[in-house]
């Protein structure tokens, strides 16, 4: 019997400098914290973790590589965090992503994954931005409707949903947003550890 297979998918927040030539490499972000903390707590649990996030990806980029980077791996647990680049490209490149199309593509990814493996467990994390500057705060116009789209998708597909935008911004109330994500998007080690904590709490409920 093969080990339980957990796949992390997403963008740079998931990628975090992983060695793409080594499928076992977990980068330096929350997937590494998840894998190391889980194995430390349960060293005899038969489980494999895979991080296949790619920096810069939007949901349509996930669509383009979904067969090779998700379906062919046949995960038992699929974790997805995507969406901030769909917002970011509007502001740095003048290349917006339609929210309805974003939701449609997101649903198609999960529909395909569930069709491939009806017993698949899905963990969805919503995209987030922390208000480290007025510029980042201005992204709310684009990001908030996208977060609502992710929540609708999660209601229909997720076995566990992690409302990261709310959780991380709540954490920033008692400290400062830069502690968790210096640029408002990419987590610090503290931020990655906090995301991993939320993830493991959600995972425990569906394991």
What spans do the regions from the language model cover?
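Alpha-helical cap/lid subdomain in secreted, periplasmic
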Residues: 2, 33-48, 57, 61-207
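Short N-terminal amphipathic alpha-helix/helix-capping patch enriched in small hydrophobics
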Residues: 26, 30-34
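Conserved active-site regions of diverse hydrolases
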Residues: 54
